[in-house]
């Protein structure tokens, strides 16, 4: 078991270096190409300008290819029979609501630059298409990269030509980073998702349910009113698959929404303890929920301190605009730090985030959970 854990850790550490290695190669290739331009002796200031232009070019190319990548999911998803649900680039999100209208909202998820969510088609022979939808982003990055490569070959070693080469290189790099199966920043990439879905019928069903739950949320359906069979907790063995483990997370979320806190906490503690396929951000999310449960329950200082690890604080800082994380921060300020002034500022942040949050029904649930914090604080004052 220990040897297996060491092997998995080495593999994880190596894969975490892959994106950096790919972009180091992009930088080296761009430097070689730029050196071919006949521009005389640039001098120190020329080199500084070159470096600044290169950094700016990389950012522009990444931004462009994030859009291309998510558009690829959309295009290949539509070709596979999927229906549009939401489209996000960084924190800018367009989502179809309960009336069928597409509205602009804001939401960011740590570890992701974008996301295109779609409603899967009905099963055919017990299966749904998953490869084109999941890998469509990488496919379109490659197509765009090849187009830029053709333009570079036509223009040669000119400034414009080399700029096109940079866009080609970043396109291919984006395709590789998303297509080579690995976990990035606590999130499974597209290639990893395809492998996870393909491992079992249960994993494929879990993938369908995830998309259906998110689509229902966008239509204003309360998670407690969705079909109960969607939230049946998979076995420990099944949850070794990341797709199935996500259903366990949804199950925990449903229990919390239903204010069954003790039941939810027991399940979350179990999921965090067993060997599972839980992705990093879901682990941190469950810890957030457990912190809340502890605060409104026994409120033991040593237990809360243990859960508020450096890693957990880092996650909460990265997700500081997420309404659930804001609610947890509010609970910490009121029930752990006893700092009402800080709590008021956090509550103002919640109201600001709520204005652009894509799922109105989640705002209602979060407000109710905040009220429970206030009730607990009031009881503490009386005592």
Could you describe each region identified by the protein language model?
Residues 2-58, 109:
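Topogenic membrane-insertion module of multi-pass membrane proteins
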Residues 57-121:
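Small-residue-rich helix-interface/hinge motifs
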Residues 79, 115-124, 182-263, 269-275, ...:
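Polar-ligand-bearing catalytic/cofactor-coordination segments
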Residues 121-218:
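Hydrophobic transmembrane alpha-helical segments that form the core helix bundle
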Residues 225-236, 261-274, 298-316, 338-353, ...:
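Alpha-helical repeat scaffolds
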Residues 238-246, 282-289, 321-324, 328:
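Start-of-helix signal in alpha-solenoid helical-repeat scaffolds, especially tetratricopeptide repeats
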Residues 250, 289-293, 324-335, 366-376:
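"A position-specific structural signal for the A-helix of alpha-solenoid helical repeats
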Residues 253, 257, 278-322:
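Alpha-helical adaptor scaffolds
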């Amino acid at each position: 078991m220990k040897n297996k854990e060491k092997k998995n850790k080495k593999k994880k550490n190596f894969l975490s270096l892959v994106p950096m290695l790919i972009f180091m190669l992009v930088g080296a290739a761009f430097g070689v190409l730029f050196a071919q331009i006949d521009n005389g002796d640039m001098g120190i200031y020329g080199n500084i300008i070159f470096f600044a232009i290169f950094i700016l070019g990389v950012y522009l190319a990444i931004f462009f290819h994030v859009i291309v990548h998510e558009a690829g999911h959309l295009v290949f998803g539509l070709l596979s029979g999927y229906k549009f649900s939401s489209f996000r680039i960084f924190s800018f999100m367009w989502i179809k609501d309960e009336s069928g209208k597409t509205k602009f909202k804001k939401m960011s998820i740590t570890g992701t630059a974008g996301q295109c969510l779609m409603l899967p088609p009905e099963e055919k022979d017990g299966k749904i298409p998953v490869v084109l939808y999941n890998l469509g982003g990488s496919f379109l990055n490659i197509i765009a990269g090849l187009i830029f490569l053709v333009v570079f070959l036509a223009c040669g070693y000119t400034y414009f030509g080399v700029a096109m080469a940079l866009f080609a290189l970043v396109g291919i790099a984006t395709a590789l980073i998303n297509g080579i199966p690995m976990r990035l920043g606590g999130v499974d990439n597209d290639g990893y998702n395809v492998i996870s879905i393909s491992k079992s019928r249960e994993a494929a069903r879990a993938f369908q349910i995830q998309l259906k739950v998110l689509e229902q949320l966008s239509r204003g359906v309360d998670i407690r009113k969705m079909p109960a069979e969607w939230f049946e907790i998979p076995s420990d063995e099944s949850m070794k698959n990341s797709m199935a483990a996500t259903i366990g997370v949804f199950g925990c979320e449903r229990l919390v929404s239903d204010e069954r806190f003790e039941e939810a906490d027991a399940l979350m503690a179990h999921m965090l303890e067993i060997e599972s396929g839980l992705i990093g951000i879901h682990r941190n999310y469950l810890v957030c929920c457990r912190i809340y449960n502890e605060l409104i329950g026994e409120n033991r200082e040593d237990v809360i301190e243990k859960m508020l690890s450096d890693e957990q604080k880092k996650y909460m800082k990265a997700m500081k605009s997420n309404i659930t994380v804001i609610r947890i921060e509010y609970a910490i300020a009121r029930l752990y730090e006893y700092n009402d002034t800080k709590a008021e500022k956090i509550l103002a942040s919640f109201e600001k985030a709520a204005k652009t949050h894509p799922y109105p029904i989640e705002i209602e649930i979060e407000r109710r959970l905040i009220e429970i914090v206030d009730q607990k604080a009031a009881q503490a004052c009386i005592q």
